Every structure is written in C-alpha cells, then in structure tokens.
Amino acid sequence: MVSYCYRFKDINGNVIYVGKTVDINKRMAQHFGGKGHLDKSCYKSVARIEYQKYKTESDALIYETYYITKYSPKYNKLGQSRDKPTIQLEEKDWKTYQVLKNQVEKGEASWGCLTYILIIALIYAIFQMIA
C-alpha cells in the first residue's frame, strides 16, 4: 500500500515535525481541522508542508524514523532521542503539499493549501456526523 512521509517547516525552513500516513489528504485534514494531536503553536508555525511517496508503509516508517533522528524536530517526541542515524538512506526529492496549480494574478482571490485542508476537514466532519 502506498504511504507518505511528510514534514512541516517553519518560516525559516526548519523542520518542526515529521510524520507518516497512508492518506496524505485525510491526514492533513486531521492536523489542520482541529483533530491534530500536536500543540497549536506547531500548526501556527507551519509555513510549508512537504511530502515523499513510498511503495510500502514499512518504507515510509523507516524514512520517518530516519528523518526524525536526523532533524530532531521540535514537535516530535522521538526526535528528542540522543541517538543519531548511523546509516545513510537515499535522499529523495520532497514535493510541496499544495492545491494551487496556477499562478494567481495580483488582486485575484485564491485558495491556499491550508484553506483547502480546512475545507476538507469540514467536509470530513460533516460526513462523520451523517454516517
């Protein structure tokens, strides 16, 4: 089953959280739709969300653990470990998690990544109430 490793970066480009999921859209909706387990200050600090796609959940778990120990993100409890990676995994390209596909002209309205995530979270919550 396809899985993802994702990371939150702050305005300075620092990795502040690393996680993994099998459904990136649902997970972002949970994080930013009020069901996230992280401190609110983490979500307020997010300036960029990046992800990598893996063929298996086991691969994503290995990379998640590797990146947490490599970057020691502020909001990962595992990142507080004193151990550092002793293996070197292949670095993959991080893709930016976003919804906008076209450049928006100045003055035009646009829907950004986090707005879209909140909309997904709202729709998901409505379906949960109906079901």
Annotate the PLM regions.
Residues 1-18, 22-102:
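Structure-specific nucleic-acid interaction/processing domains
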Residues 100-131:
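C-terminal single-pass membrane-anchor helix
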